[in-house]
A protein has these predicted regions:
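The beta1-alpha1 cofactor-binding region of Rossmann-like NAD(H)/NADP(H)-dependent oxidoreductases
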Residues: 60-71, 103
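Conserved glycine-rich Rossmann-like NAD(P)H-binding loop of the short-chain dehydrogenase/reductase
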Residues: 30-44
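SDR active-site lid
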Residues: 174-238
Length: 264
């Protein structure tokens, strides 16, 4: 999809990949609707995008709060914007063992990563269809392709997104809806710092693999190239991407490697 003069809604725009993608897209002379929970951080992203010459509308909300999402959507709808694309980058990660994680933590992860994402998507989809079709992207993860230690519900929530958006695409191809799954590996962001632990509180530590990961701005450039081409999947990362192929072609080796992952 050509981005020039298009209206694109981006969630998770306060930090990490979402923020980097918003800044990268702002170079394309488009109209960005930016969402996230932290309004101060959202305004910082807005300032960076405005410097690149794009128009910006802020629509803050909490992905874990359905009512908050609905209010933000209604506020945007009143402006009668012609929405051409929705790019879902908001979410939270996890750092806890299965047998030490209470259900309320599992539910919290799903409320943000799965239900929050599909809530906004279901609200925006009819608007995109009404405007003649458009592009929707959702952010998965390498562990949306396979299970991984200390990320059980995070991995499950990302698997769920694949099922939902593949179904959405099958149902709405006739409506000129295109869908992209963004699948990042280790990217140098604060996702591990902000991950939830077994108590449902902030993990507060930067993983070594995250610290050595691909810079967010480099990741964003790769993602935006893929979004422009409307690829079905955008796999982005360093050598960690090979795990997808190991899991598919040599599963016994994958399980051996995964079992050796150390506690965070």
């Amino acid at each position: 999809m050509l981005f020039k003069e298009k209206t694109i809604w981006i969630t998770g725009a306060t930090s990490g990949i979402g923020k980097a993608v918003a800044i990268e897209l702002s170079k394309e002379n488009c109209h960005l609707i930016l969402s996230g929970r932290n309004e101060t951080a959202l305004k910082e992203t807005e300032e960076a995008c405005l410097k690149n010459g794009s128009r910006v509308t802020l629509a803050p909300f909490d992905l874990g709060d359905e009512r908050s999402i609905e209010m933000a959507f209604n506020s945007v709808k009143k402006e009668n914007f012609k929405i051409n694309a929705l790019y879902n980058f908001g979410g939270i990660s996890q750092r806890s063992l299965v047998n030490e994680t209470p259900l309320f933590v599992d539910r919290k992860i799903f409320e943000v990563n799965y239900f929050g994402t599909i809530t906004l998507t279901k609200l925006v989809l009819p608007e995109i269809i009404k405007n003649g079709g458009g592009h929707i992207a959702a952010t998965s993860s390498l562990v949306g392709k396979f299970g991984f230690p200390y990320r059980s519900s995070y991995s499950a929530s990302k698997h769920a997104l694949h099922g939902f958006f593949e179904s959405l695409l099958a149902e709405n191809k006739v409506n000129n809806i295109r869908v992209t799954m963004v699948i990042p590996g280790f990217i140098n962001t604060n996702i591990s710092v902000n991950a939830v632990n077994s108590k449902g509180t902030r993990h507060g530590k930067l993983d070594q693999n995250q610290a050595k990961g691909m810079p967010a701005d480099v990741c964003a450039r790769i993602i935006c190239k893929g979004l422009k081409k409307e690829k079905k999947e955008i796999l982005v990362g360093k050598k960690d991407k090979i795990m997808v192929h190991i899991k598919r072609f040599v599963p016994s080796l994958y399980y051996h490697l995964a079992s050796r992952v150390k506690p965070m």
